[in-house]
């Protein structure tokens, strides 16, 4: 009996030991399995980070090529890495979207190519008055499911017109807002961004009043206080008015002829210091000459500026007054004076007496128009027709503004 009891105790001990060993084995195997899982997870994380870094390198590779060519490269490479990480570029309203893929990592970032410019076909810190109708092919802005967020005019203070106002939209045949404009759904401006008004001012979101703006800084990426840096950029050809000692403003004599001569000599970026008038003869000739170029920039600084007659300029008109204050007497030597300051004038006094820009005749701009003379007025004594063209603006801006990454545009997919 004692032997039997001792035998049973031995069996129980062995059984308990076996159970404990089994439990230990299970725990050990579980630990190893967890360890293997952790190792595998760490390996995957390392691989994912490697793929992310390589994709990020692809973005920087694309950016370097864009800077080198000052635009989209003709042939896009992997920068000699041998890894085949070739960035892809797609055109967007503010510049280019760059996408880089490697493995399961996909990164996206935007390159800005036009300073800090906001959307808008015509942009004005000057008060604007149009004696006639207004027809604008707008900046398409940003696309969403309802259509394009078009912007026809962006202005600081006052906009008024005596005639009908029409946003012509982005579906005009043979007049896309930029090369490569993708609109596969064929949608026009959103209804909230396509104004049509007669007898009243437009209330749509395509005519934007923005009290805070600095057009010079937005275009050139330099504050207006530092405008001399831009003026002295070797890309600019300067046309200077002779100094006037009799208290009258400085005026460039034969300004239209001087502009034409410079364009014909392949100087396409002109900084005009002092007042300037393009008379009817030279408005036509300068317009014709501009179409033989990628686009001209005519910037008039510290003076009155008038454009008379007919023509379609390919380029950017920029009027920038920082310290100059206009007077009706300053127009005395200009052809524009006959119309602007005729008694009675067709331009309301609230605009006429502070006018520093005057446009008369069937003249239009294909490109961009920037009127940066705060507290002054721009008077259009004609029906205003304007064709936004981003290609022209970007080409001109790229000569003065270095392309850069857009802040906040990083996106990992």
Residue locations for each model-derived region?
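N-terminal leader/signal peptides at the extreme start of proteins
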Residues: 1-9
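Compositional signature of intrinsically disordered, low-complexity segments enriched in polar residues
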Residues: 12-53, 57-413
């Amino acid at each position: 009996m004692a032997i039997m009891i001792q035998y049973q105790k031995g069996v129980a001990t062995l059984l308990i030991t076996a159970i404990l060993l089994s439990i230990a084995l299970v725990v050990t195997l579980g630990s190893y399995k967890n360890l293997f899982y952790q190792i595998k997870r760490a390996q995957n994380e390392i691989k994912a980070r490697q793929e992310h870094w390589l994709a990020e390198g692809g973005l920087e590779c694309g950016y370097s090529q864009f800077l080198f060519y000052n635009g989209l490269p003709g042939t896009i490479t992997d920068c000699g890495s041998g890894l085949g990480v070739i960035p892809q570029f797609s055109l967007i309203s503010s510049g280019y979207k760059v996408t880089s893929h490697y493995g399961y990592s996909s990164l996206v970032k935007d390159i800005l190519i036009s300073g800090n410019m906001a959307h808008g076909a015509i942009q004005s810190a000057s008060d604007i008055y149009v004696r006639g109708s207004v027809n604008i092919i707008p900046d398409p802005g940003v696309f969403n499911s309802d259509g394009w967020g078009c912007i026809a005019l962006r202005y600081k203070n006052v906009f008024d017109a005596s005639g009908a106002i029409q946003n012509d939209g982005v579906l005009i045949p043979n007049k896309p807002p930029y090369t490569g404009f993708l609109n596969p759904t064929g949608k026009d401006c959103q209804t909230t961004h396509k104004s049509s008004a007669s007898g009243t001012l437009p209330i749509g979101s395509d005519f934007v009043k923005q009290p805070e703006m600095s057009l010079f800084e937005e275009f050139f990426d330099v504050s207006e206080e530092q405008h001399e840096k831009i003026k002295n950029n070797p890309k600019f050809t300067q046309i200077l008015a002779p100094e006037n000692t009799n208290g009258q403003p400085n005026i460039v004599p034969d300004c239209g002829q001087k502009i034409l001569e410079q364009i014909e000599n392949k100087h396409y970026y002109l900084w005009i210091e002092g007042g300037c008038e393009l008379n009817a003869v030279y408005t036509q000739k300068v317009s014709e000459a501009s179409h033989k170029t990628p686009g001209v920039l005519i910037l008039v600084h510290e003076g009155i500026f008038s454009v008379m007659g007919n023509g379609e300029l390919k380029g950017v008109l920029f009027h920038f007054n920082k310290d100059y204050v206009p007077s009706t007497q300053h127009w005395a030597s200009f052809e524009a004076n006959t119309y602007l300051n005729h008694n009675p004038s067709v331009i309301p006094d609230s605009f006429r007496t502070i006018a520093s820009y005057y446009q008369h005749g069937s003249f239009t701009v294909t490109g961009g128009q920037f009127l940066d003379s705060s507290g002054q007025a721009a008077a259009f004594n004609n029906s205003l027709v304007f064709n936004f063209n981003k290609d022209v603006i970007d080409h001109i801006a790229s000569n003065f503004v270095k392309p850069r990454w857009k802040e906040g545009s990083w996106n990992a997919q």
